[in-house]
Curated annotation (Swiss-Prot):
Keywords: Cytoplasm, Endonuclease, Hydrolase, Magnesium, Metal-binding, mRNA processing, Nuclease, RNA-binding, rRNA processing, rRNA-binding, tRNA processing. NCBIfam families: RNaseIII. The keyword rRNA-binding applies. One of its GO terms (molecular function) is metal ion binding. Residues 5-127 form the RNase III domain. HAMAP family: RNase_III. Its cofactor is Mg(2+). InterPro entries: dsRBD_dom, RNase_III, RNase_III_dom, RNase_III_sf. Digests double-stranded RNA. Involved in the processing of primary rRNA transcript to yield the immediate precursors to the large and small rRNAs (23S and 16S). Processes some mRNAs, and tRNAs when they are encoded in the rRNA operon. Processes pre-crRNA and tracrRNA of type II CRISPR loci if present in the organism. This is Ribonuclease 3. GO terms for cellular component: cytoplasm. It comes from Pseudomonas putida (strain GB-1). The active site is at 44, 116. The gene is rnc.
């Protein structure tokens, strides 16, 4: 085993019994021969399961929609690429000459895919418990920053993502009334969601605020949020 791979193993916190599994996980499809796409597929499935299982246990009061959003934050490419950079993973990737020249070792998608491939490789090299332990260790800081309140996304975005996850039509917003003087108006908006029998309503000093209030009301009516999230 080369010294460089040994350094990577120390960073990952795992020593491979089968070095070939590790090398394959680090091999991009632009490189000649076999590549890490199958391992990436396996690692992605393991990552989603482990993250989902941990969230299920960590947030016993969370609804399905909340758990889905939290998991999406944990397993998104940006998060995985950040972890990969912490391991200096780009230095160990096997890339084709074209990909190497174009800076593929820095590309978010390539780094994230390689990290997922390493998860799959660890599972095959050891077992599920070992893969779970490594995933949870790598994501420990990410878990610490999670709360049920996702302050990074507004109600309209959360509602849209919830509906898209179920292949539903996007919500429709309509201003049904405007009251008050031009300098002090109140907008009244209705939000129509295909999964709800009744339209959700919101009001605010601008159309945008009224739509956000209506979207928040729709999320509560859908049971995705309880009003205290």
């Amino acid at each position: 085993m080369t010294a460089s791979l040994a350094r990577l193993e120390r960073k990952l916190g795992y020593t491979f019994k089968n070095q070939d599994q590790m090398l394959l996980a680090l091999t991009h499809r632009s490189y000649a021969g076999r590549n890490n796409e199958r391992l990436e597929f396996l690692g992605d499935a393991i990552l989603n399961f482990v993250a989902g299982e941990a969230l299920f246990e960590r947030f016993p009061q969370a609804r399905e929609g909340q758990l889905s959003r939290l998991r999406a934050r944990l397993v998104k490419g940006e998060t995985l690429a950040r972890l990969a950079r912490g391991f200096d993973l780009g230095e160990y990737l096997r890339l084709g000459s074209g990909e190497l020249k174009s800076g593929g070792f820095r590309r978010e998608s390539i780094l994230a895919d390689a990290l997922e491939a390493l998860i799959g490789a660890i599972y095959l090299d050891a077992d599920m418990d070992t893969a779970r332990e490594r995933v949870l260790a790598w994501l420990a800081d990410e878990f610490e920053g999670l709360t049920l309140v996702d302050t990074n996304k507004d109600p309209k975005t959360r509602l849209q993502e919830f509906l898209q996850s179920r292949s539903c039509e996007l919500p429709r917003y309509e201003v049904v009334d405007i009251q008050g003087e031009p300098h002090c108006r109140t907008f009244f908006v209705e939000c129509e969601v295909v999964l709800l029998n009744n339209k959700s309503r919101g009001q605010g000093v601008s159309r945008r605020i009224a739509e956000q209030v209506a979207a928040a009301s729709a999320l509560i009516a859908l049971g995705v949020e309880n009003g205290n999230d």
